[in-house]
Regions:
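Extreme N-terminal starter segment of soluble prokaryotic enzymes
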Residues: 1-6
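Structural alpha/beta surface segment adjacent to cysteine/selenocysteine redox centers
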Residues: 11, 18-103
């Protein structure tokens, strides 16, 4: 039985997008079985005291964009850093992903 690789991700997270672009190669190299684990950040932040992006200080928001640009360039993954409709309500999409995983 192959080892499992649990991938915890947020559907509308640019960080999850960057990570997802690396998963295929990682699974191919390791032979691991990929298990998708969607996470709803608002629930996680509420439980852990984290701040949603809109509630973070402007300096932290700016640094986040700077780091996303760096990682995007480093990984060679094109990314639109400030999309018009971000963040979007992902609850329906998460439910769909969970239903697909359980099917």
């Amino acid at each position: 039985m192959p080892q499992a690789l649990d991938y915890y991700f947020v559907l509308n997270s640019p960080w999850s997008y960057l990570a997802a672009r690396q998963l295929g190669g990682l699974v191919d190299r390791t032979g691991a079985a990929l298990r998708l684990r969607p996470v709803q950040l608002p629930k996680l932040f509420a439980a852990t005291g984290g701040l949603q992006l809109r509630d973070r200080p402007p300096a932290r928001q700016a640094y986040r964009l700077q780091e996303l640009a760096r990682w995007s360039q480093h990984l060679g993954v094109p990314m639109h850093l400030q999309p018009t409709h971000f963040p979007a309500d992902e609850r329906l999409a998460v439910g769909t992903v969970l239903a697909a995983i359980e099917a």
